[in-house]
Amino acid sequence: MAPELSSPSSSPRYTVGYALLPEKVSSVVRPSLVALAADRGVRLVAVDVSRPLAEQGPFDLLVHKMYDRGWRAQLEELAARHPGVPVVVDSPGAIDRLLDRATMLDVVSGLRTPVSVPPQVVVSDAAADADELLARAALRFPLIAKPLAVDGSAESHDMRLVYRRDGVLPLLRAPLVLQEFVNHGGVLFKVYVVGDRATCVRRSSLPDVPARRLLDLDAEPSVPFANISNQPLPPPDDDGGAADDDTPAAGFVDEVARGLRRGLGLHLFNFDMIRERSEEHGDRYFIIDINYFPGYAKMPGYEAALTDFFLEMLRGTRPVPEQLGPGSGLDMEARKLEPGLGIGLRELESGRAQA
């Protein structure tokens, strides 16, 4: 992890605007973050999304996670009028692929690290033939059924674990993704990425599915499941609890995070990684989900990580990662920053922008 950046009292003060849904504000912009940022010369200000962006500020940096098209239009208008001022994190065009589960995981195939994605198929037609879809994708039960769109709604998180074919048919309301469920010992590795920092946190996950469950015709063919990965695993014990050395090596995690960051062209995201352990294949890692601008309060030390990141962006010392994966081509906000680019509208309009 990069060392914390100091902020002398004589340094200029910056204003960082944030446009987030209320539930995201409560999971990121906590008093501990606000206090530390202020102590380091960064003022955090909420953007009123009901008002024109041009009437607010001035901001030196904008961070956002909004799904409204009107918000995106405002960002594009602001970028056209004042390119690079304020600095926008992250580019709406780069975020888009994470809002569609058909494209979300495409970037993984371009990584140079030994990690992959479970087999999956996109169901885009409600009249699709389940047998044909499953055969074409060579999927094996159990499956996870996920809504195709990731739009922040409760419906986008409505997932089901499907044990056999007759559990698929009622779900073909389309569009959705059917992804093969991989037994992973009930352990999920949630990796939070903030710029070039990656922090891996072990979480509990769905338990393994025994073969006999797939053959139990008296049991439900599919069941809904809640996201239970937000609870830390208990400390290791004598009853088979997860041990500290179960966590992937830091170097491996950093390499995966770096590849995703470059491939996606994003700075702020997390990804869910699982590990299959078998005598046949040994240890195999899979990425099953990538989420833009997660609830960082669940990441240890997130206040310092975000504050350091804001200062790096504002001081022009943090280059935007080159997008290498499918769909390359970043919007104008996402390009390499040069020193002095992190300035506010106040300096631009007064002609006092620092070089």
Curated annotation (Swiss-Prot):
Q: Which Gene3D superfamilies match?
A: ATP-grasp fold, B domain
Chain segments annotated as transmembrane? none
Task: Extract the SUPFAM superfamilies matched here.
Answer: Glutathione synthetase ATP-binding domain-like (SSF56059)
Q: Which reaction does it catalyse?
A: 1D-myo-inositol 3,4,5,6-tetrakisphosphate + ATP = 1D-myo-inositol 1,3,4,5,6-pentakisphosphate + ADP + H(+); 1D-myo-inositol 1,3,4-trisphosphate + ATP = 1D-myo-inositol 1,3,4,5-tetrakisphosphate + ADP + H(+); 1D-myo-inositol 1,3,4-trisphosphate + ATP = 1D-myo-inositol 1,3,4,6-tetrakisphosphate + ADP + H(+)
Q: Name one GO biological process term.
A: inositol trisphosphate metabolic process
Q: Which GO terms describe its cellular component?
A: cytoplasm
Locate the residues binding Mg(2+) 1. Answer: D272, D289
List, for all copies, the residue spans of the domain called ATP-grasp: 107-318
Q: Broadest EC class?
A: transferase
List UniProt keywords, sorted A-Z: ATP-binding, Kinase, Magnesium, Metal-binding, Nucleotide-binding, Transferase
Q: Where does ATP bind?
A: 101, 146, 179-190, 205
Q: Which cofactor does it need?
A: Mg(2+)
* Protein residues bound to Mg(2+) 2: D289, N291
- Which top-level group of life is the source organism from? Eukaryota
Single Gene Ontology MF annotation: inositol-1,3,4-trisphosphate 5-kinase activity
What residue spans carry the Acidic residues bias annotation? 236-247
Q: What InterPro entries does the annotation carry?
A: Inositol_tetrakis-P_1-kinase, InsP(3)kin_ATP-grasp, ITPK1_N
> Region (Disordered): which ranges?
225-248
- The answer on whether this UniProt entry bears the keyword Nucleotide-binding reads yes
EC nos: 2.7.1.134, 2.7.1.159
**Partners and quaternary state?**
Monomer.
What is the purpose of this protein?
Answer: Kinase that can phosphorylate various inositol polyphosphate such as Ins(3,4,5,6)P4 or Ins(1,3,4)P3 and participates in phytic acid biosynthesis in developing seeds. Phytic acid is the primary storage form of phosphorus in cereal grains and other plant seeds.
Extract the PANTHER family matched here.
Answer: INOSITOL-TETRAKISPHOSPHATE 1-KINASE, INOSITOL-TETRAKISPHOSPHATE 1-KINASE 4
The similarity annotation says: Belongs to the ITPK1 family.
Q: What is this protein called?
A: Inositol-tetrakisphosphate 1-kinase 4
The organism encoding this protein is Oryza sativa subsp. indica
Q: Which gene encodes it?
A: ITPK4
